[in-house]
């Protein structure tokens, strides 16, 4: 019986995936397209965890000249059907740098990580360099300084171009340069407050490695964003940018419908096709329908072990979420209103800036939508030409991303509401002042973003959040009591003095809000919700019925309150 291939979670080394008999979604024809492109430098921009590192690893193993052949890795792969392209296999020196680990809280710490990356790449080529009679003594000394991490700070600005020159001399062949997640250090520096220092370092390295490097055969870079206004790519005449808006290479990153269907069939999970589409599909790369590969693989691995495993957001821990949440939490009222509409399924229309920079996000509100699009939080559903510019219509791609937006809103709400002094509000609850309670809740509702597709859950979470921190009391939510489920109980922690019952209803119109508050109060009585409190010997029971209609509320005190 043939061994079932492993699902490769977090494995970004192409050789390891093949050697360990992991399931591999064949993207090798990307190599053919790369050779046909004729570009000196090509930049792929895709969201985080969309297979960029794995694809660059595949490119490295294809082109790199090594002592032991790696040609077997491409046996029976799509590229093997093209002998004219297989002739390029194992023919070039390759420099591979992944900057995704440069996420430290200070520039100094990030620079130390960069030095480690340079050291590792020099070590990887040390044998070839020192065994060659083509390397001058002064250059060998400089190589040693990089390996020992004793090079001058200024020398690191040209470290990549220096290594490419040495390798080109050793192999008598120009170098292929691969730089993965080039903008992670910039994103991190933006979030941590040392953006200018980092952009100066990256600019210096790229200028020497990509613009004025006569030893370069071609370069491939990956990242989320195209950062050009800081002059990283200025003057690079033969730069080809392939963003999510371009048709070129549109299926090279992420999984197509066909690839997902084949994988589900392989693991006997075809019945999950509709669910996985709802949760993890929805991306539109150059008009191609694309699934999030990280989330799809994680779910397939989980479901392969337990077919009843629930769908969950696997992508929520990506680094860009920190900035997305910050953008939403710190945005103006107009932006919050648009986010609210997005969550409720209403598209946003905006011009898109392909060269948006992290430094511009705070000062240009239009850049927010560009950032959200390129980092995977929006997808294009339509575009039209307006005043010779492209106006894009965008929506949230799938349920997984929708949940991330909702979590951001909860965080925003918590920060703003919980920072207020709520003692007067709590006092109003105990003093049975329904009008005052209504006023507080109404004001808070007006300030927060709402989403209404799961109305009761939203308002339930809203009020539970408001009531958290009620000193001397604890919030108990959604439990069986009497003949049914109540919405919220507030119980005194000491002495079993006071218990408070909240029941919510959604009113279809503003005019019916009082009626629905009465219905909520009647439900408390009909279902005997107070039974649990009576059993626990609470001496005083207060009952509130609350109706909600979007950002309006109506609070009513039960006449049967003690």
Question: Where are the predicted features?
Answer:
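Structural signature of nuclease core domains in nucleic-acid processing machines
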Residues: 434-562
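Phosphate-binding site recognition
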Residues: 1-455, 470-472
């Amino acid at each position: 019986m043939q061994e079932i291939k492993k699902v490769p979670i977090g494995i970004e080394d192409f050789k390891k995936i093949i050697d360990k008999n992991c399931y591999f979604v064949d993207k090798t024809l990307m190599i053919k397209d790369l050779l046909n492109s004729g570009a000196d430098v090509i930049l792929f921009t895709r969201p985080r965890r969309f297979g960029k590192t794995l694809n660059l690893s595949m490119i490295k193993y294809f082109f790199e000249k090594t002592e032991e052949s790696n040609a077997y890795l491409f046996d029976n792969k799509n590229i093997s059907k093209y002998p004219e392209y297989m002739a390029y296999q194992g023919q070039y020196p390759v420099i591979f740098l992944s900057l995704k680990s440069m996420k430290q809280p200070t520039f100094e710490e990030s620079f130390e990580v960069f030095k480690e990356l340079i050291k590792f790449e020099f070590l990887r080529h040390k044998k070839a360099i020192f065994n060659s009679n083509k390397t001058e003594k002064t250059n060998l000394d400089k190589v040693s300084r990089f390996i020992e991490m004793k090079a001058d700070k200024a020398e690191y600005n040209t470290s990549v171009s220096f290594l490419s020159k040495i390798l080109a001399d050793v192999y008598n062949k120009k170098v292929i340069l691969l730089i993965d997640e080039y903008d992670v250090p910039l994103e991190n520096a933006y979030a941590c407050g040392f953006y200018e220092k980092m952009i100066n370092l990256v600019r210096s390295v790229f200028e020497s490695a990509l613009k004025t490097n006569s030893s370069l055969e071609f370069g491939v870079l990956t990242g989320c964003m195209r950062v050009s206004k800081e002059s990283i790519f200025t003057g690079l005449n033969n730069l080809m940018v392939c963003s999510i808006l371009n048709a070129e290479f549109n299926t090279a990153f992420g999984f197509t419908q066909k690839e997902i269907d084949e994988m589900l069939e392989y693991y006997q999970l075809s019945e999950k096709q509709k669910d996985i589409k709802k949760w993890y599909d929805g991306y539109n790369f150059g008009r191609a329908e694309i699934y999030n590969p990280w989330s799809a693989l994680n779910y397939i691995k989980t479901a392969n072990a337990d077919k009843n495993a629930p769908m969950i957001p696997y992508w929520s821990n990506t680094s860009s979420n920190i900035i997305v949440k910050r953008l939403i939490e710190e945005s103006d009222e107009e932006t919050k209103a648009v986010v609210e509409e997005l969550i409720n399924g209403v598209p946003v229309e905006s011009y898109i800036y392909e060269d948006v920079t992290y430094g511009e996000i705070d000062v240009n509100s239009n850049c927010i939508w560009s950032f959200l699009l390129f980092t995977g939080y929006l997808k294009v559903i339509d575009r039209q030409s307006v005043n010779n510019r492209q106006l894009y219509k965008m929506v949230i791609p799938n349920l997984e991303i929708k949940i991330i937006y909702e979590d951001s809103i909860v965080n925003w709400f918590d920060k703003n509401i919980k920072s207020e002094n709520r003692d007067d509000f709590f006092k109003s609850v105990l003093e049975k002042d329904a009008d005052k309670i209504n006023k507080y809740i109404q004001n808070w509702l007006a300030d927060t973003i709402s989403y209404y597709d799961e109305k009761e859950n939203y308002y339930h979470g809203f009020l539970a959040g408001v009531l958290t921190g009620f000193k001397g009391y604890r919030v108990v939510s959604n439990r069986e009591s009497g003949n049914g489920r109540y919405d919220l109980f507030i119980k005194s922690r000491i002495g079993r003095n006071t218990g408070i019952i909240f029941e919510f209803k959604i009113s279809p119109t503003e005019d019916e809000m009082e009626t629905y508050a009465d219905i909520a109060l009647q439900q408390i009585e009909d279902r005997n919700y107070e039974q649990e409190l009576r059993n626990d010997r609470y001496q005083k029971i207060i009952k509130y019925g609350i109706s909600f209609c979007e950002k309006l509320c109506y609070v009513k005190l039960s006449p049967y309150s003690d």
